[in-house]
Structure formats: structure tokens, C-alpha cells
From Swiss-Prot:
Keyword Cell membrane: yes
Catalytic activity: di-trans,octa-cis-undecaprenyl diphosphate + H2O = di-trans,octa-cis-undecaprenyl phosphate + phosphate + H(+)
Enzyme Commission numbers on file: 3.6.1.27
Protein's gene: uppP1
Biological source species: Burkholderia lata (strain ATCC 17760 / DSM 23089 / LMG 22485 / NCIMB 9086 / R18194 / 383)
Main localization of the protein described in the UniProt heading: membrane
Topology relative to the membrane: Multi-pass membrane protein
Additional note from the record: Bacitracin is thought to be involved in the inhibition of peptidoglycan synthesis by sequestering undecaprenyl diphosphate, thereby reducing the pool of lipid carrier available.
Protein name: Undecaprenyl-diphosphatase 1
First-level EC class: hydrolase
One annotated GO molecular function: undecaprenyl-diphosphatase activity
Keyword set, alphabetical order: Antibiotic resistance, Cell inner membrane, Cell membrane, Cell shape, Cell wall biogenesis/degradation, Hydrolase, Membrane, Peptidoglycan synthesis, Transmembrane, Transmembrane helix
Subcellular location per the Swiss-Prot or TrEMBL entry: Cell inner membrane
GO process annotations (BP): cell wall organization; peptidoglycan biosynthetic process; regulation of cell shape; response to antibiotic
Similarity remark: Belongs to the UppP family.
Length: 276
């Protein structure tokens, strides 16, 4: 196996793990990093989706007891059934729109320049949302994921649709959207984690079936390396983020998004790199 390819797979895995659950867009970072590393062949998008599987396994491990409790409680506990229903409701809008517009989105938006614009716009939205949160005088309406209603879940699910635009961020859309709809910051963050499970599992399965030719003996090793790197880095990131949101807002991520997006645009339009 080519050592250069191994290094690229590990780098992209770490990028995925560190950015999947932060409001900075993992897909956007993978597109930019893949272009910079010249890791953008016909199977690159499949690689990007498959290594997300490693990142979501980190969430499953972190919440393994909660997930086991929900699954075992489905036959007898109303709260487990209600929570599962909320996850399903919040997942449907993004899946429906994703299946409808997948080809057009990948053809038009899966390149660094559109990602850069989305990063800047998303950063501005986060700044606006955080300013609005500071002006609120009443406490959040929903203080636990168990208090979510189906309508709350639907609203967060609609917000998640913005993440179909690379660079907007799935976690950013769901967390900021949830906060605007009255969810406590930690509740919005945790619900965003749970929403990632069906979305990423589904995307991984879909890409695996659709592009099964990408899974050769050589590429399978790269996929595994990338997924392992994503798992380890995502596990560290998830634990850190849960502590961070207890006492901080997302303003720093907004400014990072804007700065990174402007940097990508500057690099592209100055001719330093050709963002193909």
C-alpha cells in the first residue's frame, strides 16, 4: 500500500473526526482537504462518506448505555418510543431532500469555492443566532431530550436540511436551529449527536451499495484506516464538546468558519492553488 495514500487517509480521517460534530462542516473540510491533498478521484466522495461511519461509532460508544436503554425499552416504555419517534421525524426531511437532489448537489456544490461561501454564510448565521440568544430573557423551553415534542423534532429536522449544502454543517444546522426553537444548548447538542446516527449510517450504506466497485483490496485498507482515525478523533471531540457547551457559546466557531472560508476564497482567486 502506498505510504503517501496511507498518510492522506489518516489525515482525512482525523479531519472528519474533529469536524463532524462541531458546527464547522466536516463535509466542507473534507472537500477542501481532499482537493489540497489531491485526494479527489472518482471514489473520493465514497471514502468521505465511509469514514463518517468511524466518527458516528464514536457517538454510539459514548452513548452506548443510553442507546441500549432506548432499544430495550421500546416494547414497554413510552419515553423510549417517543424519543425514537422524534429521531425518525427529524431524520425524514433531510433524507427525502437528499434523495431528490443528490446528483445536482454533488455536481454543483461539491468543490472548495461553493464550500467557502457556505462556510462564511453559515458563520454569519451563527453570529446572528448567538446574538439573539444573548438578548433572550426567558430560559430555554426544552431542558432535556426527553421533553422534546414531535413538532420540536420536525423543526430541527427541517433545519438539518440546510446541511445538504456542503459547508453549512449538519451539527451547526441542528444545534443552532434547535436553540432558536427553544432547546437548551446542551439538549440541542445531544439531540444533534443522536440525529447523526441514522443519517450517517444510512449515507454509508447507500454509498456502499451504490459505489461497491470502490471497495477493492487496496482501497478497503485505506477506508479502514480513515475510519479508525475518524473514530479516535471524534471520540475525543465529542467528550470535549459536551464539556465546552456547558459554559461557552459557538461564537468562536462562527469566526473560524468565516476566516477559513475567506482563506479558501483568497487562495483560489489569487491563483496560489487551483481549487478544482
Amino acid at each position: 500500500m502506498d505510504w503517501i495514500l496511507i498518510c492522506k487517509a489518516l489525515i482525512l480521517g482525523v479531519v472528519e473526526g474533529l469536524t463532524e460534530f462541531l458546527p464547522v462542516s466536516s463535509t466542507g473540510h473534507l472537500i477542501v482537504a481532499g482537493s489540497f491533498l489531491n485526494f479527489n478521484d472518482s471514489h473520493a466522495k465514497t471514502f468521505d462518506v465511509v469514514i463518517q461511519f468511524g466518527a458516528i461509532l464514536a457517538v454510539c460508544w459514548e452513548y452506548r448505555q443510553r442507546i441500549a436503554s432506548i432499544v430495550s425499552g421500546l416494547p414497554s416504555r413510552p419515553d423510549a418510543r417517543r424519543f425514537t419517534l422524534n429521531v425518525v421525524i427529524a431524520t425524514i426531511p433531510a433524507i427525502a431532500l437528499g434523495l431528490l437532489f443528490e446528483k445536482k448537489i454533488k455536481a454543483v456544490l461539491f468543490s472548495p469555492v461553493p464550500v467557502a461561501f457556505a462556510l462564511v454564510v453559515g458563520g454569519a448565521i451563527i453570529l446572528w443566532a448567538e446574538a439573539r440568544q444573548r438578548e433572550r430573557r426567558e430560559p430555554p423551553r426544552v431542558m432535556s431530550v426527553d421533553e422534546l415534542t414531535p413538532l420540536d423534532a420536525l423543526k430541527v429536522g427541517i433545519a438539518q436540511c440546510f446541511a445538504l449544502i456542503p459547508g453549512m454543517s449538519r451539527s451547526g444546522s441542528t444545534i443552532i436551529g434547535g436553540m432558536l426553537f427553544g432547546l437548551d444548548r446542551r439538549v440541542a447538542t445531544e439531540f444533534s449527536f443522536f440525529l447523526a446516527i441514522p443519517i450517517i449510517f444510512g449515507a454509508t450504506l447507500y454509498e456502499t451499495v451504490k459505489d461497491w466497485q470502490a471497495f477493492t483490496v487496496d482501497s478497503l485498507g485505506l477506508f479502514v484506516l480513515g475510519a479508525v482515525a475518524a473514530f479516535v478523533s471524534a471520540f475525543v471531540c465529542v467528550r470535549w464538546l459536551l464539556r465546552y457547551v456547558a459554559s461557552h457559546d459557538f461564537t468562536v466557531f462562527a469566526w473560524y468558519r468565516i476566516a477559513f472560508g475567506l482563506f479558501v476564497l483568497l487562495v483560489g482567486y489569487s491563483g496560489w492553488l487551483n481549487w478544482a
